[in-house]
């Protein structure tokens, strides 16, 4: 098998699970077997990748870009369903043969349950204003990020889908808290 690295290793676990699915026509399919290496963050992981101690990793596109441009790393695929503007010639994992694979790096703003609705509304309006401003969108897009539809309802739906996905990955991979 291969060794791989990821700070949280969840994207790689999803990759291993999805890449190991063999269809009925795949008589020679052996599955995908990899050994995870726990890291305490992307910095040490990147050093080991650049130093040749590990052969591959999942990392955010903005972190990898300077190393790709310098010729020190080769981007093999992006983990979104659409190609990334920073890497227009790099296929998606979906295009590379693992259907519907998607592992996104994302951030959002959340408040505690029970926060008074007027406060939620005020925060959401301010967040929407910032996220829809041309300056913010342009800055995020130059870093390779996709700006989603802002608002509590789309965000809650997205978070619920992420919880569902990663819960399945955790259970299927047999991941236990340490």
Label for each model-derived stretch:
Residues 1-178:
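Conserved, function-defining micro-sites of small-solute handling proteins
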